[in-house]
Amino acid sequence: MGLNLLPIEMDDIRKRLDREPNEIEWRVIDAVWSEHCSYKSSKIFLKSFSIDSPNVIMGIKDWQDAGAVDIGDGWAIVIKVESHNHPSAIDPFNGAATGVGGIIRDIISKGAKPIALMDMIRVGNLKIRKNVWLLKNIIAGIAAYGNSIGVPVVGGELSFDDTYNDNPLVDVAAIGIVRKDKIKPSIVDKAGLKLVLAGLTGIDGLGGASFASRKLSGEDEIGAVQIADPFAGKIILDVTLEIADKVEAIKDLGGGGLAVAVTEMANGLGAIVDIEKIPLRVKNMNPADVIISETQERMLYAVEEKNVEEVCKAFEEYEYPCSVIGEITSEPIIKFRYFGKDLVSLPTNALLEPPKFLWPIKNVRKNVEEKNVDLPLESTIYTVLSHPDLVSKEWVYSQFDYEVNTSTVVKPGDANGAVVSLPNGKLLAIKADGNPDLCSEDAYECGKGIVAEAYRNLATVGARGMVAVDHLQFGDPKKPEVYYTFVEAIRGIGEATRFFNIPIVGGKVSFYNENSQGKPIKPTPLIVMAGLVQGKLLKNRVEDSSYVVLLGYTRKELGGSLLSKIFKVPSQAPKVRLQEDLLSSEVVIDAINEEKITFAKDISRGGLAASLFNIIVHGYGVEISTKSILSDTDNVVENLFSESSGRFVILTNEPEWIVEKSRSKGIVASIIGKVNKKTSILTIDNTDYDLKTIVNNYFNFLEEVIGNG
């Protein structure tokens, strides 16, 4: 049957049913109990994320399709992150496009209007032509769907590593807006509701949930990839928002198709579905395939009988299929029948409660012997600053319509965080962060670090983080070293979110990100954080003769850094000191509101050198004295490329104010240099380094490699 269930799971369900499931029931169980849908290897740990916060309307403990947070004035934002990693490795265009479609439907399932998308893409070495092809088509897929459906892509991440040569990661996050008294659940609480399905069911995406719950085999898996139809998606979006007041619950048909959607929506009650009433894209489909098909652009609604006609009439105006396919029952049994014959009859609770797994762990935290870095400064600067991770992503953003709906306040790439306007007049900042290199060194510190980095990034535009979602992407959880990094990353994320009092209201776990030889990707947890601008918004600008202030203390912590990755420098991973991140962020927000700074950049990938380079690409030069850097090392390379957390580069005309404000908060700050008009020149301790070639690479790299690829 090609099932992905373990023998112990098959024995478990036999005991619960006291019989052997039939072949179709096995396929339903395989989908509902898949790692992708059930979180059977992770759910016990995810519960540690729950934070009771008065502004959380719908959080992780509610286990719904998206989280919702009160933002005041009767409004709420809805936030979700998802991925389409496996499909994008096989069919990058449709894999990425359907990822966008799926996340949008998760948002509208809450009755919310999507207002922003973010894409976080990780691919392999661009010297390999396949990776160029993958990236080009991933970007095209995201653009095709987002642009067609009218939701702006306002920011994201793009990075490169050999670990993703066979396993690209394609994450998409979405934000929606809704009146908080209009939020819709994805589950029901009473029987008698009619199940209404919008959309045609086809043979694409068969076994997609199971496909996403195992490693890529290298065999022909194209049938598990769904096909995107953004114009149908636009109809689903518009009509769902139109009829939201007429339905009791809304559920996107994603992984596992109707098998999962019906089971989860029933929420411990039961359901009867008549397969012959389901509108089909392909004639004479196998009933079992109909149940688990993951055809896109479909939604399931639980509707009072009196409202069914009005709901379907709204779809009929667009000539979009809509049909009553069943109903919610009080008997806790999920039934799929075909012309009156039961093909599936399984207890709801048995489906919703798969066996939970705690796999063995093996400590893989590295003990590294520190050595002094002995690298030539000039070539090190050129090599690190030329890395693809640090180049402009303008070519990517130019493929997206990021100004549709006119809610985008900060153009992608112009700041550390995206900013969109809300109906209540407030500004919402959004940022995504991950750090797989650090996670490879110390997953616990990485978990803390990505939360802290997202928090700092929001501070650079004047916002304070208030809510987050996470996406945890790892290899096979049954491998002790993989499961260890997963558990440690969760421990770090949980500690940091509790420290900042930021509730995680949802997320996703993606295991089995491995190639056909079983080699896992680097552990890649991701945080998407949102927060309201606290007063004034900072749009970075560079002015001649501005002072360069380094906020925070620099440490010889090069493990997991870009320098360490390129030059194989042995060093300890940075210890994330959350108090320093919090206090330095507060200084930045205060300085923005007092209009004391014109530019703020958190120090992360590439260290201080990369942050200074971010000033230079605005058409200026920068001169600094490394003797002014407050640090535990006098090694210039270590000071320039350390990725210690809790630090910012600030441009100001009142440097003493910044230093004094920092001192009052209990953190350090130092005036390390000035901006000048020596275009593309970085001056370090009175020595000039001409970065014209690096600046040219910064602006043109992606277009030359991908646009002409």
Curated annotation (Swiss-Prot):
Mg(2+) 2 binds at residues 106, 252. Its EC number is 6.3.5.3. Pathway: Purine metabolism; IMP biosynthesis via de novo pathway; 5-amino-1-(5-phospho-D-ribosyl)imidazole from N(2)-formyl-N(1)-(5-phospho-D-ribosyl)glycinamide: step 1/2. One of its GO terms (molecular function) is ATP binding. Keywords: ATP-binding, Cytoplasm, Ligase, Magnesium, Metal-binding, Nucleotide-binding, Purine biosynthesis. Substrate binds at residues 83-86, 105, 226, 294-296, 510. It is found in: Cytoplasm. It comes from the Archaea. It is an enzyme of class 6 (ligase). Mg(2+) 1 binds at residue 82. ATP binds at residues 39, 80, 470, 507. The active site is at 36, 84 (proton acceptor). Gene3D superfamilies: PurM-like C-terminal domain (3.90.650.10), PurM-like, N-terminal domain (3.30.1330.10). It catalyses: N(2)-formyl-N(1)-(5-phospho-beta-D-ribosyl)glycinamide + L-glutamine + ATP + H2O = 2-formamido-N(1)-(5-O-phospho-beta-D-ribosyl)acetamidine + L-glutamate + ADP + phosphate + H(+). Belongs to the FGAMS family. Part of the phosphoribosylformylglycinamidine synthase complex involved in the purines biosynthetic pathway. Catalyzes the ATP-dependent conversion of formylglycinamide ribonucleotide (FGAR) and glutamine to yield formylglycinamidine ribonucleotide (FGAM) and glutamate. The FGAM synthase complex is composed of three subunits. PurQ produces an ammonia molecule by converting glutamine to glutamate. PurL transfers the ammonia molecule to FGAR to form FGAM in an ATP-dependent manner. This is Phosphoribosylformylglycinamidine synthase subunit PurL. The lineage of its organism: Archaea, Thermoproteota, Thermoprotei, Sulfolobales, Sulfolobaceae.
